[in-house]
Amino acid sequence: MKKGLSRRNLFKYMGVGGATAVVAGCENNPEKLIPMLVPPTDYEYTPQTAYQYMTTCRECDAACGMMVTTREHRAQKAEGNPNHPLNQGSLCARGQASMQSLYNPNRHAYPLADGKQIPWEEGMQQFTAIIKAASGAIAYLGKPASGSEGSFVDEWLQAAGGGQRVNFDLLTQNSQNAANKISFGRADIPEYAFEEAGLILNFSADFLENWGNSVENARRFADMHAYQSGRKNKFIHISPHVSLTGAKSDRWIVINPGTEGLVALAIAAVIRNKNDSHKFLKNYLAAYSPEKVSEATGVPVEVMYELAADAIKHGPLLALGGGNVSATDQSVETLVAVNILNAVSGALDKTVRFYDQTAPESSNHQDLTQLISDLESGKIKLLIIDESNPVYALPPSMAFKQALKNTFVVSIAAQQSETTNAANLVLPALTAYESWGDAFPRSGVNSIQQPVMATVNNFDAKAREDILLTAAQSINKKAFSGNNNYLDYLQKKWQKIQRRVGDSGSFDSFWISVLENGGIFETSKYKSVSLNRKVTAVKVNDPGLADDNGLTLLPTTSLLIGDGSGANKPWLQEVPHPMSQIVWDSWVEINPETAQKLGINDRAIIEVTTPHGSVQATAYYHFGIHRNAIAIPMGQGHQNSGEVADGFGINVMELLSDKMDSAGNFALVGNRAELKLINEKSYTVNTDGNARQLGREIAGATTVEKLSKGEAHHGGHKRPIEFYPDRSETAGYYKPYRWGMTIDLDRCNGCSACMVACYAENNIPVVGKVRTGIGREMSWIRLERYIEGYGDDFETRFS
């Protein structure tokens, strides 16, 4: 027998040792490949069987219907509810990514008192004690609630001894409500029937992104703009900035910032003179003729006459206005002007339709200013902040964070944020996936929100309404009598809905049908409106933002992370912005002509300074912006919102003033900026490679005329569509289906929801900014953006 170590055993031991070294280098906590090795006994389930729950998306106030697929009682994928009348089975990118709110590791896992973990019992004791001590000097700050939550909070404040409720939404539509009140006597938002329009004149409203219900708008716009019967309806974008919405337009009319209202009135003046309608407007509109407003708007006289002729020839017209880019201190006046244009063109009750029920008016940003004043003076002893993030979202000049030092702050929230970091007491709340609620986003649309799974392990959270209800009942035994939890309260509200819709059956069967369907959806009823004569008292002025006294700053909103509430979702950070193709960052859009005059290269680091603050970000050349303006998207620049959000980009709100319009909403546009070159190069990651097709015919296009005559080329030459040899001769290989995908790129608006859905469906990992920069793009679907042409006549194509 040989002594010593054989060659075979040597390699064997080396292999074992190498494997041991690899294992030792991994994380200490082993991954559980089989999560249910010991199945739970407290509920029944069938392994690998999918169940769908109908609920409501709460990523924004659009409140789309949602269908959540679960397996083993875990939520796995969100899709749109096909039964819902608004989104009809679709979801936007934020809706697709909403699952990351549920499983986010940066959720609050337990109550915190001054940043230290405490048990729930102690947290509730502190909460009830401060409610008693406040003696009605309470303020409740939360997002606008269209469902039962609003009345619940009002009743809770009464039970707690009194107080005030203030709604906060940075992207509110209150200016539009105010304009509609002046124009039609209705302080609510109408239905915009895109599909009924022959021409859309859009005055800076980003209706495919963050204006109204973008999912519904996208569907209806696609129907309106589709090629049908040899023709295609027109969409003209009238704005100082081309957003994703503007990129889908047939024509861009560049205007001076803040002059949307003047252009709308000039077009209305021409149309009114042609059809001789609304005689009471004759003298009023004469002051806004194309000849009189051309210099102020920067739009040639003949162009405004062309737009009026288009509206007459290709009607019905749909004129839209509002959004960030037009949010000057004259927002209300601008929107009244758009309403006048719709009225004189005959759009009312055709493409602009009001419901028979009016929506309740909500608070505005002036109410928030008063709240800050009350905090500073010590009038408010207890401030409850429900999920919103005003510390991040408000301009620093309002000194909201400093005012919090004068009161006791309780934050009831699921996610970490700058606001929860500033609170004295944090009570972790459940997400919308784990709790009950409802929403009534439109007349006749009653949507239910139900828990689709139990609370995620490791997060000791409670429903925010149950937290409030428990506290109220511990103080006032008569509070919410007969309600053991918020579900009881909610069901009583829905009993009233059952009676209203005429359902005479048992409530149990009615409730089950509501949960199965996602709500109760009644047929919309409309009420005719007419233009109020008092619109002639509204004066639309030139804001004077196109001179050489600095560049006008246009804060825009990303369709991905919105106002910043989506910044801690890695899918939304890693999916490239459809226009800039930039990931994990902020940028400053600047016209190439302006940049070259200032000696600023594309992708250079520049310093942006306004009278209110200064930030550094990357310059991004964009033909689609006025030469005397720059644009910076909102939503980045977080400091205490979780590891995904923190440290990326800048917060544009740090550059803005606290000036407001006549409706009490922030005048986001009106701040002048100076630029300074800091560095010739920046580390900004974008995925487009080259914005030009370089003759490769990747994103082909044709004209309606050629298509109608049959002269349009099919777009390329036949190429193999698969790597493998054809197996059509193999019996049964393509039965029952042969998989394929066809995408109508003419209807695609670049919303990127498909890319986020790809991450969700296939459990694709994110790699972060650095690895994306070296080509580690993990999504199985790419959305390529190509630029054609130069200057104001450029064109954007998606492929």
Q: Which ranges hold each PLM region?
A:
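N-terminal export/assembly segments and adjacent metallocofactor-ligating motifs
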Residues: 1-275, 283, 291, 300-302, ...
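Domain-level signature for respiratory redox metalloenzymes
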Residues: 2, 67, 138, 192-199, ...
